[in-house]
Amino acid sequence: RIGVPAKVGYKALNYDAPLDVRGVPVVALAGTCMEAGKTAAASAIIARMRHRGLVVDAFKATGVSLRRDILAFEDSGARHTMIFTDLGVVTTTAKSGPALTRTMLTEMASGQPDVIVFELGDGLLGTYGVESILRQPDIKAVLTAVALSANDPVAAWGGVKLLRERFGIEPCVVTGPATDNAVGVEIIREQMNVEAFNAISSPADLGDHVITRLGLGHVRESKVAAE
């Protein structure tokens, strides 16, 4: 890559921005903590979607200023990417998180992708705004699928419980280091009744599962060749 001068924000964040995803399916990647495998999972899902012929736009909604994650999304095939620093925010909070998410969802959807994938940096419990975002009824209403990244089966159990009981969200899949071995996968599937795939060893299975949950399994790989 060739570096370019850093600039925070190409436009100001509107805290009253409306949300309109124009019917585009949305996949959210949440985690039990930082470094739980969210970016790896998002990248694997994006790569599989591109392989299947889908046009994918992606963004990172929360965390601290670091473009590495969205560069990974681009390397995996995302057409357009954004991060909260594009809106002048260098560290997200409970106040800015929902507005940032609405703004980036709306902007991504305006390009009419087949699907939007976004990562919620930090864990479900933290100070960067993830909890605030997942409490917003309008944002929850547009989430077609939520994938949970967890470091171990105990974290997976707690994360699934939080999503279900605190936020009223049913995760479609668990990934992350908790799925690094067959024992972890079996525990998640049997004790939590949630599908589990590893983003590193089974990226195609992870991506295909999410695509099926979105109802986009009919898209033909030949679409890529036609672009």
Predicted regions and their residues:
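Gly-rich Lys/Arg/Thr-decorated short loops/hinges at beta-loop-alpha junctions or inter-strand turns
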Residues: 24-28, 81-89, 140-142
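Walker A (P-loop) phosphate-binding motif
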Residues: 12-64
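NTP-binding/hydrolysis catalytic cores, primarily Walker-type P-loop NTPases
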Residues: 197-227
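Short, flexible helix-coil linker/hinge segments at the edges of structured domains or between repeats
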Residues: 1-22, 74
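A short secondary-structure junction signal
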Residues: 39-43, 69-70, 128-130
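Conserved catalytic-core segment of NTP-binding enzymes
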Residues: 1-9, 66, 93-115, 120-206
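N-terminal phosphate/diphosphate-binding loop that engages ATP/GTP or pyrophosphate donors
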Residues: 47-92, 161-163, 175, 183-191
